[in-house]
């Protein structure tokens, strides 16, 4: 029986231990049944270090069913050639916080995918600053969630106001 268990676990492992292969297996086999609301923010941040979030320096700082917050540095990864925050990085930050918010609201047998992101860039953030995204739920339906995400500079100047629509689907 232990050989069958090891074989089943090996079917999940798609990367070496150096690439978090074991962590990936545990995530797929065990953590998949855990609600996002039950996972500490530091663990969510650590899991994302090799994903877009990690590449952009995004860190979750607060999360509950009504609000999610995260920060992102304005640096070589997230700025335009002119030294100001890139609009697409801002939209990625918004979709990230709204995505976690929807995952917190979902049941373990559901997944969330982004359907629409639209934003208005109101002012700029400059290299060296850290922006903060605040996502609040506008609509929580059975099959979709709508989030408003405001992005602020470290001095609380509004940079962007973004609307994110997520689709809620049953896992296959």
Please annotate each region the language model reported:
Residues 1-36:
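Mg2+-dependent phosphoryl-transfer enzymes with acidic/Ser/Thr/Gly-rich catalytic loops
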Residues 34-172:
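Terminal targeting signals and extreme-terminal segments of soluble enzymes
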């Amino acid at each position: 029986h232990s050989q069958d268990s090891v074989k089943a676990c090996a079917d999940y492992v798609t990367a070496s231990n150096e690439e978090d292969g074991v962590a990936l297996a545990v995530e797929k086999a065990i953590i998949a049944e855990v609600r996002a609301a039950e996972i500490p923010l530091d663990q969510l941040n650590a899991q994302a270090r090799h994903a877009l979030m990690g590449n952009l320096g995004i860190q979750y700082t607060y999360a509950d069913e009504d609000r999610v917050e995260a920060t992102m540095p304005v640096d070589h990864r997230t700025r335009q050639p002119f030294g100001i925050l890139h609009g697409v990085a801002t939209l990625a930050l918004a979709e990230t916080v709204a995505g976690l918010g929807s995952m917190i609201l979902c049941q373990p047998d559901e997944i969330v995918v982004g359907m629409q992101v639209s934003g208005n860039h109101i002012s700029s953030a400059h290299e060296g600053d850290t922006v903060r995204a605040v996502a609040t739920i506008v609509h929580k339906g059975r099959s979709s969630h709508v989030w408003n995400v405001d992005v602020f500079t470290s001095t609380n100047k509004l940079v962007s106001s973004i609307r994110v629509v997520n689709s809620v689907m049953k896992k296959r």
